[in-house]
Amino acid sequence: MVNYGFLSTYPPTQCGLATFCAALLHHLSNPMAGSRCGVVQVVDGAYQTMRQDEAASVITARPLTASRAAEVLNRYDVLIIQHEYGIYGGLDGEDVLAVLDRVDVPVIAVLHTVLASPTPHQRLVLQRVIDASDAVVVLSQTAAAALKAGYLIDEGRVSVIPHGAPILGHRRPGRASGLHRPTILTWGLIGPGKGIEWAIAALSHLRDLHPAARYLVAGQTHPKVLADQGEAYRDGLRRQARTEGVSDLVEFDPTYRAVGSLMNMVRQADVVLLPYDSTQQVTSGVLIEAVAAQRPVVATGFPHARELLGGGAGLVVPHQDPQAMAHAIRRVLTEPGLAEAMKERCAKLAPALTWPSVANDYRALAKSLLAAPVTVAP
């Protein structure tokens, strides 16, 4: 069996990469079969090891230098590194290169961000990460195209493996009897750039729906936003809702939810709304989870949304356009057969998006690297 080392943020850190790493680790780990996993955790740009119990919950942490981090990771058969510029130290996260330069096991680099227009230094850092890796994983076809167009890499080293999602039961949770009030849901860590202000503005165009729609914004404020700005963004959204006259339609739920509770909430939604401001986002875990949960999606036209929803799993609208957003939501809630057609399309996509399926793809990739002939320098 293969033993996997990870270089990544990791819970209790609250960020998408930490959640991703924990889920992938869980589904790759198989102690009964002799396959173990370990993490060198990235915290505020520094490295530390973690001692874990069988459930992978953190007990203690020990700081590491780059050379010691590499030494720890070299104890595993394969290293899986999560890459995003903001999690590593140095300019554009360049400190990660000092670790990669010292690693002598096969490296799989998972690129969560492939910018369409990087700065010269961002391009240099990512190119060096690519050069230090034996395989590169991107999470969408759009990201693969951007990577091949903007960087020097053999196409055979690039794999597209989607972000994973939990497996859900086939039955949707029951509803209370009576007139159903539709729920529009946005969830995830909250902060500027999520576009929630445009969603609130869209509600004023949906006042005539009966029964009135409820817009549920679920999730805690992003820790970095909270540290820098406090709850200014969330407070501003509340003020906007009052000004727009839709405060009775908007509900904020800052509760931290475990995976089961979160997915139960998602399955109760009539529409998942992703009003993001970004025009370059090539992967979205929330989008993957919504599709895997077979929920109709309305999203702004960021690249991953255009790719995943283009076949009918959702509707894509222009950025920062409340009227277009409202029109799409109205269609999902009122147009006969549309929501069901979206769910059917999501159901066809869902099996390949589950974490067990995704983990199998990583497992196959790791085994192919270990089976490859070793080139010995003359």
Model-derived segments and their meaning:
Residues 120, 148-149, 164-180:
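Acidic anion/phosphate-binding donor-loop and adjacent secondary structure
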Residues 142, 164, 221:
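Carbohydrate-associated surface elements
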Residues 176-194, 200-203, 216-218:
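Conserved donor-binding/catalytic core segment of Leloir-type glycosyltransferases
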Residues 229-256:
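Nucleotide-activated donor-binding/catalytic signature segment of Leloir-type glycosyltransferases, i.e.
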Residues 272, 292, 296-299:
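Short hydrophobic beta-strand element within catalytic cores of glycosyltransferases
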Residues 311, 315-322, 331-337:
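Conserved acidic donor-binding segment of nucleotide-sugar-dependent glycosyltransferases
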Residues 331, 338-352, 364:
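A short, well-ordered alpha-helix in the C-terminal region of glycosyltransferases
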Residues 355-378:
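C-terminal alpha-helical cap of glycosyltransferases
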